[in-house]
Amino acid sequence: MTTVLIAPLRRAGVLAKQAATIDALSGGRLTLGLGVGAREDDFQFAPASFHDRGRRFEEQLDLMKRVWSGQPVSDEIGPVGPPPAQAGGPELLIGGYTPVSIQRVGRWGDGFISWGVRDPEQVRRLFDLAEESWRTEGREGKPRLVASLYYALGPNADRGGDYIRHYYSYFGPGADDMARSIPSTQEALDNLIRGLGDVGADEVICWPTVAELDQVDLLAELVG
């Protein structure tokens, strides 16, 4: 699972072929999380246009769906392989935290993935928007709902805040708020994971913010 890959930084045709190849090699186990991105410096470096990234993302989704379903790409270009193992392409999760980004779930996605969870009630509102977009497009069933969170456990848990402040420095004071809110005890992390389950998360992805392997062991002790 990619959580999430910033599609507007990339060429849609190449990305579609790469994803289809990985899906075929893995026997259909690829879940592709995609979003538009929020860091303008990423786009300056690429380089790629930043302010029209939402429109370009939707054009990319249209193209990738055509490629994966075996349709001609254009009047001049026929179907392009390799075919993915999953019919219609890999499972596609749309990431984001604004209503506009979440509205794309119903039209193009198989589900929604939230980002950097701190408050289950906030995630509930995002999940509700994803389900609303699903119904608006007249789709059956429900979207897959995935939550992701940061955590730091053990004697060096305070380093987790340093990582968040550095990575999200472009948020300004918001980076400090994020750093202070990451769970740093097993009780706090357990409460957050349970809270996300209560608001409808089908899966919770936990990202350690301390670069030590024992973070995985400490998480395993908690979740069993």
Stretch-by-stretch model annotation:
Residues M1-G224:
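Active-site-adjacent structural elements that line small-molecule/cofactor binding pockets in enzymes
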